[in-house]
């Protein structure tokens, strides 16, 4: 296990909290453990904010969860498999873990995936500190695996970036990840599909639209519309993506939601992001 002083140093370097760095370190080892298991490696495609940071853009915002799409609809995340993942993490890092929750996800009485919460006692502690009961641990990782998702682009092989003094295994030298276009098309759909308005979705679309190279927005729009139809949703106009209600909600939550994931000096004002996204959405969907 890395030392607490490394967590402290990285927190100062990135201008975020120690708990954010501790979780980032732990996330890397969870990805490593998951892709060290053949059944996971063969079925799972890494996606989401942690994928963007770990596999595409090393100085991207920090993330909190692990998200995957399974290309095998028969894949099962049961307690035995999850404990196998945990055992690998513990063996490689010395991290103490506690399985908090494992849930079957369902929609209209049909299984759609799995969500797990694993508490961890990470590196942000003195080595001689005895961990309290897991009920008092405040750090955890959420893992979500979706079984039924329409993928429009081939996955791409990426290496997991791990900016810490310990090392990951060769299992993550190449792992299957979402194409950036796939990420963006799902982020667009999330603006409509989520039951809550997530500032990170707006930030991710804004950031990738500005800094990702050679994006084909016609392909992304097509994929977005296909994904909407796959979920039984209809796109009627950009007011579904940005409207007074969502803007007010996101603006109020902007700093609280993203402030622990990005240094304050790097976090753009929501009004700047909103202005850029209005222009982007009007350009992409001008014929709809």
Please report, for each region that a protein language model flagged, where it lies by residue:
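Structured mid-to-C-terminal alpha-helical surface segments
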Residues: 1-44, 54-60, 64-66, 70-288
């Amino acid at each position: 296990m890395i030392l607490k002083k490394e967590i402290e140093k990285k927190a100062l370097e990135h201008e975020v909290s120690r708990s954010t760095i501790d979780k980032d370190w732990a996330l890397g080892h969870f990805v490593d453990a998951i892709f060290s298991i053949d059944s996971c490696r063969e079925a799972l495609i890494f996606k989401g904010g942690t994928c963007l940071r770990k596999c595409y853009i090393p100085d991207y915002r920090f993330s909190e969860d692990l998200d995957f799409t399974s290309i095998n609809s028969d894949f099962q995340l049961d307690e035995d498999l999850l404990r196998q993942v945990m055992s690998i993490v513990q063996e490689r890092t010395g991290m103490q873990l506690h399985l908090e929750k494992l849930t079957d996800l369902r929609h209209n009485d049909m299984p759609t995936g799995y969500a797990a919460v694993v508490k961890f006692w990470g590196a942000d502690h003195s080595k001689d500190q005895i961990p309290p009961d897991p009920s008092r641990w405040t750090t955890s990782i959420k893992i979500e695996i979706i079984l039924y998702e329409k993928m429009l682009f081939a996955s791409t092989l990426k290496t997991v970036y791990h900016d810490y003094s310990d090392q990951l295994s060769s299992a993550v030298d190449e792992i299957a990840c979402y194409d950036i276009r796939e990420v963006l098309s799902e982020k667009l759909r999330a603006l409509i599909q989520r039951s809550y308005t997530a500032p990170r979705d707006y930030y991710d679309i804004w950031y990738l639209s500005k800094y990702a190279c050679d994006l084909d927005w016609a392909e992304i729009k097509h994929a977005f519309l296909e994904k909407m139809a796959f979920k039984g949703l209809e796109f009627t106009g950009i007011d579904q993506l940005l409207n007074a209600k969502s803007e007010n909600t996101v603006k109020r939550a902007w700093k609280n939601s993203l402030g622990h994931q990005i240094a304050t000096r790097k976090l753009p004002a929501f009004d700047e992001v909103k202005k850029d996204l209005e222009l982007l959405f009007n350009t992409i969907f001008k014929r709809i």
